[in-house]
Amino acid sequence: MKSKYHFFIVAFLLVGLCSNAQFVKKHGQLSVKGTQLVDKNQNPIVLRGVSFGWHSMWPRFYNAKAVDWLKKDFNCTVVRAALGIEIGEYPYLKATEFSKEKLEAVVKGAIKSDIYVIIDWHSHNINLQEAKVFF
């Protein structure tokens, strides 16, 4: 009887641990319905995540290892990659290729970790033409 009880406890814990294992695969493309974020099946969904600081000021954190760590240790289902446009040592307007490399590292890390990523065009000015080209 004890072994059966232990089996169910372990099984329950494993289900809980694996619930975010394939988060994007499970929920697919997200959209907004009214005021609610919904998944591919129109079911309400809540994302939990962390924001990276601007890539132009803290580029050392823009890598797949950091994304994986955030997923595992913080149980993130989304990360925000803030692309610094004008400010910092390597802003997008002055170091475009470097900026794209840093952003791509986070995006690839999110894909590998099966979590969502929000790309933030973080600009204190409009830079509309540059934003159109980027997106």
Label the model's feature ranges.
Residues 1-22:
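Bacterial Sec-dependent N-terminal signal peptides
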Residues 23-135:
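Active-site mouth of glycoside hydrolases
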